[in-house]
Amino acid sequence: MDKSRDGHPYWHARAWLCLVLGALAASVLVACASSRKEKTQELDLAQMMRWLPGTYSNVAQHEADVKAGKPPHEALDIAIVPIDSPIMGPHAFYLQEMAADDPRRVMVQQVITFEIGPSGKIKESVATLVEPRRWRDGQLTPELFTAMVVEDLVPMSGCDLFWKRSGDGFVGADEPLRCHTASHTSEAAARTQLVAELKSTELALSEQSYDSSGVLMQGRAEDPLYRFRKSNEHKQ
């Protein structure tokens, strides 16, 4: 009889080999799962980048509210165009929000950028502009943004949105306790909840700011989402 078997080293070696092979197999499975998840996130990000650019309006929502006797959502138009600047990254956009009945009344100007963050989630970062008038109506002349640099931006720190696939679209939300946007009644809110939804021809946005007592300072208490429908695609 083989003495190595009598003294157990043979069986110990086999057991050790099995453990090593098992660990290697588990590592391969984890790596494969991670790779699949990363690939899925890349495909989701690419899909969002195709859907997002364009011109949107929520006039239909406004009219439906009026017809139903509800407090109407303000009628707004939103234009979103890509920013062609290597400094801004491959997934950067200019967003301008205007009154639907008067495009000269501009309410919001932002630069939004997208990336797959360290956690593997799709992250949207939001920034306002140091000189809003310089970039006003930039959606009409997108070449203007080739001159944009990071110093032109004021990041909304803590207000990143994290996106995930949901049904036939995507949903995004921030971490409210980290986001402290200024409101009309106070310099900074204790928490701000940002929510967004994106489908191939639809975009929904809401912003609700609360004070330290939980009282709503800005935004709608009921039906907070402004629901926009795409009126035209952005032409590359």
Model-predicted regions and their roles:
Residues 71-105:
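N-terminal glycine/threonine-rich, aromatic-flanked beta-hairpin/loop signature
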Residues 38-69, 94-236:
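Calycin-type beta-barrel ligand-binding domains and close structural analogs
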Residues 4-20:
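Bacterial N-terminal signal peptides that target proteins for export
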Residues 30-31:
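C-terminal motif of bacterial Sec signal peptides marking the signal peptidase cleavage site
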